[in-house]
Swiss-Prot record:
Protein name, entry field: Putative DNA ligase 4
Stretch list, region Disordered: 945-1212, 1245-1310
Main location: nucleus
GO molecular function, one term: metal ion binding
Length: 1322
């Protein structure tokens, strides 16, 4: 089956899994692939796919010998490109950043290079062919391991290049990328091997743990539906070792094992090895399941002779025994000794070992430990320490307790000192140890036993010395210097890696880390002293840190002879952990200007002394630790030294190691960065001599001393410390602001100040960095955390100010006080203006400088006079277009803004002006009205508001009752144009929340909130039956329209500027859909009682016009009463006609009484003018044919007052008009329609005028409207003609064209009239 499954199918799964975010989706894709590609007949081929999914667990193939660096060079040869070509350099320097993408990810970098040389079509390579090619690639490495000639290495590299070249020809770039990741055994799929095993079969992980054989797992568990009986371990098959859990201190470890029998063992610093003995066949399996056959020459004979059973499995540690010092050697020499036993002393590394051995031999001769003949033959050898047994004879013992396994171990293994040892509390190493050394393993009965054993193991295991040890050490070191081997010195201390605590009743579990074994290491307890070292180089990271420096090469200073600043630095170690991402980014940003690329084999900077070892060689150097600059100032010359590098404080394991990689005599194990020392200059870093003194002081002979009674006590200032937040805790010092949820947070400076003052200080605001809501302490503290009865200083005041919530402060209040206490009004007339400056783009880029200067100047003008500049459009009150060289209109602005910001332009509060407004205001030292300079069209706001505002339900109880009476009309009323006609469409979406419109509060009256009725109640588009109106009802509704809430479509609120002591006027415009000429018959036949009730409540409610009323000006109840009273006085009782007698007498009397109580004169400065008769745009007036009735005259008089109130706004207010989008579109398409005046249109107008109220489409010679005195100049300046005598005004307040000006260029007509005119011949 694998012969037919394409590799591209597996690659597609890899790509999908790398994009998925959840592990469940990844597992599902793996399951789908296994079910799809491997059906019931192909289950035996699961191994061919899983070995590619889990390349790290495939032990049959072995090692490829190709990591990133070697793979890059082989790939360059396979592609046949020059080594100095850009692509070859890109592959070689895959970690480096710069302008490259995917830096730090070798597979992605290689895919970029391959993409330019490979096609996108797959070559149809199968999974079997891929496995065969990878087997050949691994076979070349395994065959070359038998030889060490350079020629064979070159041949091996060429053979690998040919294999990769053949794969490149049969794959595309995507498939080759995943092949390289399989070779590197790092797929980065984001799914664990445990998840893969569980998706393959529920018992797969358990079987792999005891066999470590992926093929066996795939063959035995090919049917997912059948469970497998748990298999035991077998000799010859590697077993996953049992692991230990890390603990930070002895007390926590003892709590986990409390109540159990515990054994404490020394944790050796060697290689974890399982020894499998099957007769004379010996295997040495590491924890990675690899068989280390190099240990066989030195250990096989010892194991065969001293293990008393034919078949067994031992678990232990492979170490090196130093026969000269009679101790275990330091970590790192295992492999060297194994190779020395196998190949002889031929390499340079073994030559270095010889020099070490010579120095040790001289020391041994002086202390008479060893004869000269024995030195070269028995100085160091391999030694195995077994601490557990898993198999003995023909039986697995992993299910027995640790106590029983220790007993079996003592029976099976015969210890041989320096070769084979066992680690048990009652024998083995404990018997062979010198009398003055601590035990290697003990039974712990209490926490004190554990702590004592840990201290003895880590701090007090030394080589026994004689009185002349110091002299011998000097002799040894001088001898090493004579051999030019000064990078090494002799370490007489044996510091073990830590201790292991084990439960004696526990069973041996493969791969388990559940807490039955606990490890305690010295670097978990207390690290070595912090070392202040200097950064001299950097290494690029991989993965998410790819392309950026992620690790640093640090150095030690070499002391100068003349006591001046150091001039040379030795490479010391490589460190990269310990910093957060933010700290690391800040450090790299600071050092990046001083990085210099390391172009090996060029020499490093002259300040640094390095070994040029491949593991030491950094990617970048710091040019120099210091930077001197000579400056001249008049007759004075002075030199300034600046620090280019940074000092960092590092810590590590307390054990130091000899190093061949770095130039310093010692290096550190597991170094990590503690903190950044920006406060230290470069010349104060640690020098070599001081570091050597630290090492020697820790390596000298120590004696167990009595406990120091001079340590600081916890009761120095009377307080106590608690690890847990219990009831006894009175104060808590937190590290994060999240602790504010638990209570008040106190700054640590409070403790320091209390200690300094020798008394308990009061908690002042400066000690509370996270001020809590003060409702908890209202009797002591105010809303800003200021105590009523405690004095505060400047620091307290600053803390209070810094914690104030600026959002709770009313901006209007701030502006009020700024304006009130401003010294000069000339510098605050822009107060309250938040301006967004739109920089118009320039066609010619050469004028950018001029434009930038202009923008900078207008911003300064704004801020100097109290305004604010905002960077986003949302909070802006003004949008100023800054255009220097070309005119920029609103259409250009609207098109250039993104859709998300265009909606802000429809806000009536946003003023869109040119920069001329700001310049003129600054020149006149006052804020000029924006209307003259406005660029926003008149109709933009109205149309968009009508489309975007939400509908609301009326909040008045009486109106709700009236709506119930008018339900039939609402049901049969047609919907607006463009809305779906089905009832389901209306109910599919829930009704939006009502839009509450709040008016300003006047005096002691409450602010008015009017709710607009939803669009379903719109009566402006009723059917054909509504053409027969009830004149009496209409007349009553006309009179009451100023006292009733409007129940039509949403009105558009227009707020005019406040004049003097009068309140700002708000006028509500009616949309075109509420044309009274289209109201239905049912809408006109209203009950007389209903009208009377509306009239009675006119003085108690603030309501809008009836749906059939035009757009009118909304005013307060007091103003309406005075205006109505004035109307009655002007018309008089003699002017009323017969039609007026049809009104309800009670209703009229109540209205007159209400009107006489609230009298109000017209606003000052308004003059009454008479408008000539003119038909409003294609609609013939009916007033010339039918005598106007008194009730019509009354309504016209009301409209005169409304018009006067509308037109008497601020001097520069622009007149607004409603423009229907369809109407405008038709006029643009057929301009001649604006000039047409057909009989059909007149007939339609006449027919509509018969049913319309008097204010719609009609005007008489007595139509009067007040006009502001100063409106002419302002209107002319804004581009809008001012109304004058003899002009006609529509009911919406839009000025009609002047009759003396001739025919208009574009005459506005109703789109229904246009449709009727277009369809008249049809």
């Amino acid at each position: 089956m694998a012969a037919t499954v394409r590799f591209g199918l597996l690659v597609a799964m890899f790509q999908a899994m790398s994009r998925d975010r959840t592990a469940a989706k990844k597992r599902a894709r793996l399951r789908a692939l296994l079910d799809r590609a491997y059906g019931p007949g192909g289950r035996d081929d699961y191994f061919s796919a899983l070995r590619l999914v889990l390349p790290g667990l495939d032990r049959e193939r072995g090692s490829y010998g190709l990591k990133e660096a070697a793979l890059a060079s082989v790939l360059v040869d396979a592609l046949g490109i020059a080594k100095d070509s850009p692509d070859a350099v890109r592959l070689t320097n895959w970690r480096r950043g710069g302008g490259f993408r995917n830096a730090g990810n070798f597979a992605l970098v290689a895919a970029e290079v391959l993409q330019r040389r490979q096609g996108m079509t797959s070559g149809g390579l199968t999974i079997k062919e891929v496995n065969d090619a990878l087997d050949r690639l691994a076979a070349t490495e395994n065959s070359v391991c038998l030889e060490s000639e350079k020629l064979l290495l070159i041949l091996d590299r060429s053979e690998k290049a040919s294999i990769l070249s053949s794969l490149i020809k049969k794959t595309n770039a995507l498939e080759m990328k995943w092949l390289l990741m399989i070779i590197l055994k790092d797929l980065k799929l984001g799914i664990s091997e445990k998840s893969v095993f569980h998706e393959f079969h529920p018992d797969a992980e358990d079987l792999f743990n005891v066999t470590c054989d992926l093929r066996l797992v795939c063959e035995k568990l090919n049917d997912r539906s059948q469970r497998h009986k748990r298999q035991d371990i077998e000799v010859g098959k590697a077993v996953r070792p049992q692991l230990s859990m890390r603990v930070n201190n002895a007390s926590s470890a003892w709590k986990k094992l409390h109540g159990k029998q515990v054994v404490a063992e020394c944790k050796f610093d060697g290689d974890r090895i399982q020894i499998h003995k099957n007769g004379e066949e010996i295997h040495f399996f590491s924890r990675s399941f690899l068989d280390h056959s190099e240990y066989a020459p030195g250990m096989s004979k010892v194991i065969i002779e001293n293990i008393l059973v034919d078949r067994c499995i031992l678990d232990g540690e492979m170490l090196v025994w130093d026969t000269v010092l009679n101790r275990f050697a330091e970590f790192g020499s295992n492999q060297e000794i194994a190779k020395a036993a196998k190949e002889g002393l031929e390499t340079d590394r073994q030559l270095c070992c010889i020099l070490e051995w010579i120095a040790s031999y001289v020391l041994a001769l002086c202390v008479n430990i060893l004869s000269c003949q024995d030195f070269f033959f028995s100085n160091k050898r391999e030694s195995y320490v077994a601490f557990d047994i898993l198999y003995a004879g023909d039986t697995s013992v992993i299910h027995q307790s640790l106590t029983e396994r220790h007993e079996i171990l003592q029976k099976v293994v015969r210890p041989l000192k320096g070769h084979l040892e066992i680690l048990v509390p009652t024998g083995g190493l404990n018997i062979h140890r010198p009398p003055d050394e601590p035990c290697w393993s003990i039974l712990a009965h209490s926490l004190d036993d554990v702590e004592k054993f840990f201290k003895d193991t880590v701090d007090n295991r030394f080589f026994p010395t004689s009185p002349n040890t110091d002299e011998l050490s000097n002799l040894s070191i001088s001898l090493m210097i004579q051999f030019r081997f000064s990078d090494y010195s002799i370490c007489y201390v044996l510091r073990e890696e830590g201790i292991i605590l084990k439960d004696l009743e526990s069973k041996w579990e493969p791969g388990d880390r559940s807490g039955k074994w606990l490890k305690l290491k010295p670097d978990y307890i207390h690290a070595g002293a912090d070392l202040d070292v200097i950064i001299i180089g950097g290494y690029y990271g991989s993965g998410r840190r790819g392309g950026e420096v992620a690790q640093f090469l640090v150095g030690l200073a070499v002391p100068s002879d003349d006591n001046s600043y150091p001039k040379r630095f030795l490479s010391f170690c490589r460190v990269g952990t310990g910093l957060s991402d933010e700290e690391l980014d800040a450090l790299v940003t600071k050092l990046k200007p001083h990085f210099r690329k390391n172009e090996y084999p060029k020499k490093p900077p002259r300040f640094y002394e390095v070994t040029n070892h491949s593991k030491e060689r950094p990617d970048v150097w710091i040019e120099s630790p210091d930077k001197q600059s000579v400056r001249f100032r008049k007759h004075l010359i002075y030199c300034i030294t600046k620090c280019r590098s940074v000092i960092i404080s590092i810590t590590s394991d307390i054990r130091t190691i000899k190093s061949e990689v770095f130039a310093a005599p010692y290096s550190l194990r597991f170094p990590r960065i503690q903190r950044l020392r920006y406060d230290k200059p470069w010349h104060e870093c640690l020098d070599v001599q001081a570091f050597v003194d630290i090492v020697h002081s820790s390596n000298g002979t120590t004696h167990r001393a009595a406990d120091d009674d001079n340590d600081l006590k916890n009761v120095k200032n009377g307080g106590s410390f608690s690890m847990n937040l219990n009831d006894s805790v009175t104060h808590c010092i937190a590290a994060e602001k999240k602790a504010t949820r638990q209570g008040r947070i106190i700054h640590y400076s409070w403790i320091l100040d209390c200690c300094k003052e020798k008394r308990l200080l009061h908690l002042q605001p400066k000690f509370d960095p996270c001020l809590q809501p003060m409702h908890k302490f209202p009797e002591e503290i105010d809303s800003y955390a200021d105590y009523f009865y405690w004095d505060i200083d400047i620091s307290d005041l600053k803390q209070i100010f810094s914690n104030m919530d600026r959002a709770v402060v009313d901006s209007n209040m701030v502006h009020h006080y700024k304006k009130k206490y401003c010294a000069d009004e000339r510098f605050c007339f822009f107060q309250g203006c938040c301006v967004y400056f739109y920089h118009a783009p320039l066609v010619n880029a050469d004028y950018n400088v001029i434009s930038d200067l202009a923008l900078k100047r207008v911003k300064q003008d704004l801020t100097m006079h109290g305004g604010q500049v905002c960077s986003i459009l949302a909070p802006a009150t003004h949008l100023i277009i800054v255009s220097v060289l070309q005119a920029y209109n609103f259409d250009m602005l609207y098109k250039s803004l993104p859709p998300a910001e265009r909606r802000y332009l429809h806000d009536k509060r946003l003023q869109v002006v040119s920069n001329k407004w700001l310049e003129d205001s600054v020149e006149k030292q006052t804020r000029l009205p924006e209307t003259t300079y406005s660029l926003k069209p008149d109709t933009l706001e109205e149309i968009e508001i009508e489309r975007s505002e939400e509908t609301v339900q009326p909040c008045n109880d009486k109106l709700e009752e009236n709506e119930k009476a008018d339900t039939s009309h609402v049901k049969h009323a047609p919907r607006k144009r463009g809305r779906p006609s089905s009832s389901a469409s209306r109910t599919a979406k829930p009704a939006p929340r009502p839009v509450r419109r709040t008016r300003a509060r006047r005096g002691n009256q409450h602010a008015k909130i009017d709710d607009v009725e939803p669009e379903e109640s719109d009566h402006g588009e009723t059917g054909l039956d509504d053409q027969i109106p009830d004149t009496d009802n209409i007349s009553k509704m006309e009179v009451d329209s100023f006292d009733k809430d409007q129940v039509s479509a949403r009105p558009v609120r227009r707020t005019r500027a406040r004049r003097g002591k009068q309140h700002a006027k708000i006028d509500y415009g009616q949309s075109e859909e509420s044309d009274p000429g289209e109201t239905g018959q049912d809408d006109q036949r209203l009950d007389a009682d209903y009208i009377s009730k509306m009239e009675e409540d006119s003085s108690d409610r603030d309501q809008g016009a009836h749906p059939t009323a035009p757009r009118v000006v909304r005013r307060s109840r007091a103003q309406r009463g005075k205006w109505l009273a004035k109307i009655d006085r002007e018309t008089g009782p003699g002017e009323t006609g017969q039609d007026d007698k049809k009104l309800n007498a009670d209703s009229i009397s109540k209205m007159e009484e209400h009107a006489h109580d609230k009298d109000q004169e017209p606003p000052p400065g308004a003059q009454l003018i008479t408008l000539d008769e003119q038909e409003p745009k294609g609609i013939k007036s009916s007033t010339t044919e039918t005598p106007s009735s008194p009730k019509h005259e009354r309504n016209q008089t009301v409209l005169r007052r409304d018009t006067a109130e509308t037109t008497s706004s601020a001097t520069c207010e622009k007149m607004e008009q409603m423009v229907d989008p369809l109407h405008a579109m038709l006029l643009d398409m057929i301009p001649s329609l604006g000039q047409m005046k057909t009989d059909v249109g007149n007939r339609v107008a006449e027919a509509k005028a018969e049913t319309n109220p008097p204010w719609v489409g009609s005007s008489t010679s007595s139509y009067v409207a007040p006009v502001p005195q100063a409106s002419a100049s302002s209107a002319s300046s804004s581009g809008v003609p001012a109304p004058h005598a003899g002009s006609s005004t529509q009911s919406t307040g839009v000025p009609a064209p002047d009759p003396t000006a001739g025919a208009p260029k574009k005459k506005k007509v109703s789109y229904k009239d246009v449709a009727g005119a277009l369809l008249k011949d049809w």
